Amino acid sequence: MKWLTVFLNNPQSHKPTYWCFLACVLVLGLGVPPVKEALAQSENPWGISPFEFSARLIWKTEGRKAKAQLFVKSDRYRIEHLGGIRTELGYAGVTIVRLDEQKVWYILSERRTVVSVPLTSDYLLPFTVRLEGETSRTLIGDSVVGDRSAMLYEVVVEDRFGQTERFFEWVDPDRNILLKLLSQDRDWFVEYGHVVVSSQPDYYFETPLGYRMIEAQEAQIPKG
C-alpha cells in the first residue's frame, strides 16, 4: 500500500485541497537506484520490453494477489485491473506506466480523472529473460506455466548494495519469453499467461481525452 498526497485546485478557495489517495500498487521492493539512473546503468532494466505483447498478468506481493490484463509496448505498459484498484477517490480500473514520461497514471473513469504519480522502481515489471544484476543462472529442467511448456531456471541477482536475491524463472523455450518469476527470499511473484506477441496501438498508453489530470506525491503511511 502507498499513501499519496493529492493536490486539488479548489475554485472556491485560494488554498489547495489535500486528499489522501490510498492505492494498492505493484510494490516490488527491489532497492534499485532511482529509475532514470537505473535505466542508464542497466543492460536489462525492468520495465522495458524488447517486443510488444499482451498477456494475462498475475502478481503477488506482501500477501496480496491480483489479476489484470497487460499490454506492453517498449518503455510503456497498460494494466487493466480485474475488479479495479480501490482508492480514496474511487476505483481505478486502469494503470498506465510510462518510463519515458517518468510517470504512472491511475485512470478513474467514474470521476473522469487521471491521478499522476511519480514513477519509482515499485511500479516496474520484469520483461526480459536475463535479469538486471544477474550473477548466475542454473537450468533445473522442464516445467509448465499454465498451458505452456517452460524451462525452469534458478537465477541469482545482486543489487548495487551487494545484496543478493534468488529467483525461480520460467521461460518459454520456443519464443524465449519470460513466463513467470518467483522470489525465493520474499513473498513475491509475477506471471504472464496467454502471451500474444503483436503490435499494440499507441492510444492504449495515453490518458483519455477530456479527463482532468491531478498530481500526487508520496507520503508516509500514518501510524496507528
Where are these regions (language model features)?
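N-terminal leader/targeting segments and the immediate start of mature chains
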Residues: W3, L22-Y77, T207-G224
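Bacterial N-terminal signal peptides that target proteins for export
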Residues: W3-F21
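Short, exposed beta-strand/loop patches in secreted or surface proteins that constitute
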Residues: P45, A68-V72, T95-V97, R137-D142, ...
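A short, amphipathic edge element
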Residues: G63-R64, T128-I140, V190
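An acidic-aromatic
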Residues: A68-F127, S183-H194
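N- and C-terminal low-complexity/disordered segments
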Residues: F71-S74, R98-L99, L108-R111, D174, ...
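Gly/Pro-enriched, hydrophobic low-complexity segments
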Residues: G83-R86, G93-T95, G146-Y211
